[in-house]
Amino acid sequence: MNNERIYQVLKGLVFSEKAQVLGDTAGVQVFKVDINATKLEIKKAVEKLFGVEVVKVNTTITKGKTKRFGRTLGRRSDVKKAYVTLKAGQDVEMADLGDTAESAAE
């Protein structure tokens, strides 16, 4: 998997109370991912980008709501989240992302 695809697959971390509790207790990190990304792609992207070992990946798709924008009806985009379980004792640090991005650019 090339670096361009990694950054297409992983859109960012999810910062919520549920994600915080899962990260602290169960070693699970929550990412927003591309709607077309597979579990295998997500696993490879996290392992390559953060240098951690992934045990399993669970995904969920949240359907976008229909909302009113003035007079017209619109629809928000669907969002796919990946719950990534890491090997015991490992953690994803945002500082790791900066180091990897710099080394990948070289």
Swiss-Prot record:
GO cellular component: ribonucleoprotein complex; ribosome
GO molecular function: rRNA binding; structural constituent of ribosome
Record keywords: Ribonucleoprotein, Ribosomal protein, RNA-binding, rRNA-binding
A Pfam family this chain is assigned to: Ribosomal_L23
GO BP terms, alphabetized: translation
Superkingdom assignment: Bacteria
NCBIfam families named among the record's database cross-references: PRK05738.1-3, PRK05738.2-4
Described purpose of this protein according to its UniProt entry: One of the early assembly proteins it binds 23S rRNA. One of the proteins that surrounds the polypeptide exit tunnel on the outside of the ribosome. Forms the main docking site for trigger factor binding to the ribosome.
Family: Belongs to the universal ribosomal protein uL23 family.
Subunit structure: Part of the 50S ribosomal subunit. Contacts protein L29, and trigger factor when it is bound to the ribosome.
Name this polypeptide is given: Large ribosomal subunit protein uL23
